[in-house]
Swiss-Prot record:
Alphabetic keyword roster: Cell inner membrane, Cell membrane, Membrane, NAD, Quinone, Translocase, Transmembrane, Transmembrane helix, Transport, Ubiquinone
A GO molecular function held by the record: quinone binding
Domain of life: Bacteria
Purpose of the protein: NDH-1 shuttles electrons from NADH, via FMN and iron-sulfur (Fe-S) centers, to quinones in the respiratory chain. The immediate electron acceptor for the enzyme in this species is believed to be ubiquinone. Couples the redox reaction to proton translocation (for every two electrons transferred, four hydrogen ions are translocated across the cytoplasmic membrane), and thus conserves the redox energy in a proton gradient.
Keyword Transmembrane helix (UniProt): yes
An annotated GO cellular component: respiratory chain complex I
UniProt membrane topology term: Multi-pass membrane protein
Entry-linked Pfam families: Oxidored_q4
Name the UniProt record assigns to this protein: NADH-quinone oxidoreductase subunit A 1
Subcellular location: Cell inner membrane
Subunit architecture: NDH-1 is composed of 13 different subunits. Subunits NuoA, H, J, K, L, M, N constitute the membrane sector of the complex.
Length: 132
């Protein structure tokens, strides 16, 4: 039964077993060799050798999350355009038209976001409606 497996399958199983064993070994050694001090000082926050002051709960602006979402949305286009550029000769004009439509759709989305003010950092311009 086991002889029917290809050598690559055995290599994959050995790799997975080795990775699992290494993870368990590191977790086990950390548990055995690690310190177990409990107390009031253990639960205090520590920042680069300086005692912290104030609250650690800072409020961040939603603008950073907006920029992160826009980066993810418009950053996804790069792998598609790279793959298109690599296979340009094989795809011909059909691939060129598809890539042009893809980039055009992304540009329409970018212009829409600019029009509604999603790319502006000032709150008064962002409240503008798209039909104004």
């Amino acid at each position: 039964m086991y002889a029917s497996f290809a050598p690559a399958t055995w290599a994959l199983l050995a790799y997975l077993f080795g990775a699992l064993a290494l993870c368990l070994l590191m977790l086990g050694l950390g548990r055995v060799l690690g310190g177990r001090s409990h107390g009031r000082a253990k639960n205090l926050p520590f920042e680069s050798g300086v005692d912290s002051t104030g609250s650690s709960r800072l409020r961040f602006s939603v603008k950073y999350a907006l920029v992160a979402m826009l980066f993810v949305i418009f950053g996804i286009e790069m792998p598609f355009l790279y793959l298109w550029a690599v296979s340009l000769r094989e795809n011909g004009w059909a691939g060129f038209v598809e890539a042009t439509l893809f980039v055009s759709l992304l540009l329409v989305g970018l212009f829409y976001l600019h029009r509604v003010g999603a790319l502006d950092w000032s709150p008064e311009r962002r409240r503008k409606k798209p039909h104004d």
